[in-house]
Regions:
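Short acidic/glycine-rich loops and adjacent helix/strand connectors
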Residues: 1-375
Length: 375
């Protein structure tokens, strides 16, 4: 059976194709459009689909839209519609509700009734728990937001997800980190990795104050809302300089987020007793925090979905639909499911661009020599 997964709601639009339980193709729209993150994460972009990625996935497998048994869209507008006090969510929800029609228009031959909404964090969880080598694992999803939550903790048993805890919005470790990213003069929903790096240059001297507002609650949840950052450091203007209070603030937030994540994972282990923890969600891209979880929790193994951000929900949506149909396949063997090119194709493009090149027999040895010569 053939399942196409789609992420389009926030940022990093992507598509993934699962055939008979196995991932056969996956790609982010940015690889075709050459626009970083595919689009900006605003409600008014929710109608934009990963059209090129979808078509490439189908072509890679030799399928047409009519061959699809179902399409999974990694956001459920019915849940999001219940969120109060967000003036922009109705726009996003309206576009999401119309996704079946948008998809049928983008993929002629697709029956719009085959489009199914998969809850955002369930898609994240599936991208980890259904793709990992172990069929028995705990799963931890932490990001900015889904429809109404910012966190999911659960466990997988032979493909079945049991949800043990969710953290409701507005508490969100991901949105906390995004807010700090913006305060430090970087692009939110894009440059969080720069904040993680900046943290290594600072001292966590604001940690005691931050612990008062960002902390685990002991029941699998947490409190985390962005404070007035000017209490700690003025807003940074991106003028190429950094350090001082800004680096210390980054270090402090990184430290408190790590502490909460360790507490969440430890609580989850107490509920499941599993050897293996699988992770997904944008916060799982914080490799420094992941290393803390691996070192400081009882889990013996930690498996992080390589596409932990929202692009991975396309993969998760497809895997979730396949699992529901009893099409549970093999673990994800690689992250390299995207487009590739042959050596001859690359050579032809270089000739067209009149770029000189060589094809050494001992490629690794020659590259090593160049690197050794500071090349």
């Amino acid at each position: 059976m053939n399942y196409l997964g789609i992420n389009a709601i926030f940022h990093d639009p992507a598509a993934a194709l699962v055939v008979d339980g196995r991932v056969v193709a996956a790609a982010e729209e940015e690889r075709f459009s050459r626009r970083k993150h595919g689009k900006r994460p605003v409600p008014f972009s929710a109608w934009e689909l990963p059209e090129q990625a979808m078509r490439w996935c189908l072509a890679e497998a030799g399928l047409t839209p009519a061959d699809l048994d179902a399409v999974g869209y990694s956001f459920d507008p019915a849940i999001a519609a219940e969120m109060p006090d967000d003036p922009y969510d109705p726009v996003r929800v309206d576009y999401a509700r119309r996704a079946p029609g948008f998809l049928a228009e983008a993929l002629p031959g697709l029956d719009r009734d085959k489009v199914r909404f998969v809850e955002h964090h369930v898609a994240h969880a599936a991208s980890a728990g259904l793709a990992a080598p172990s069929r028995t694992s705990s799963v931890l999803v932490v990001d900015g937001r889904g429809e109404a939550h910012s966190h999911l903790a659960g466990r997988y048993r032979d493909g079945e997800l049991e949800i043990l805890h969710r953290q409701a919005l507005p508490e969100s470790l991901g949105l906390l980190y995004e807010s700090l990213t913006d305060h430090l003069g970087f692009l939110r929903s894009s440059d969080e990795f720069k904040v993680m790096a900046l943290a290594s240059y600072g001292e966590p001297r604001f940690l005691p104050e931050l612990r008062e507002i960002v902390r685990a609650t002991g029941d699998g949840g947490f409190t985390a809302q962005a404070p007035d950052w000017t209490r700690f450091a003025p807003r940074r203007i991106d003028d190429g300089t950094w350090g001082g209070d800004h680096a210390d603030l980054a270090a402090s937030v990184q430290a408190v987020v790590e502490e909460v994540l360790v507490d969440l994972a430890t609580w989850l282990h107490g509920q499941t007793g599993d050897r293996v923890l699988t992770m997904a969600g944008g916060t799982a891209l914080n490799c420094v925090a992941n290393s803390r979880i691996w070192r400081d929790t009882p889990f013996e193994e930690v498996w992080v979905q390589p596409a932990s951000g929202d692009s991975g929900t396309a993969l998760g949506a497809a895997l979730h639909l396949a699992q529901e149909a009893g099409d549970l396949g093999a673990p994800q063997p690689t992250a390299a499911f995207g487009r590739s090119w042959s050596g001859e194709e690359l050579a032809q493009w270089l000739r067209t661009a009149q770029v000189p090149f060589t094809t050494p027999e001992d490629l690794a040895g020659e590259v090593a020599d160049v690197l050794a010569d500071n090349g």
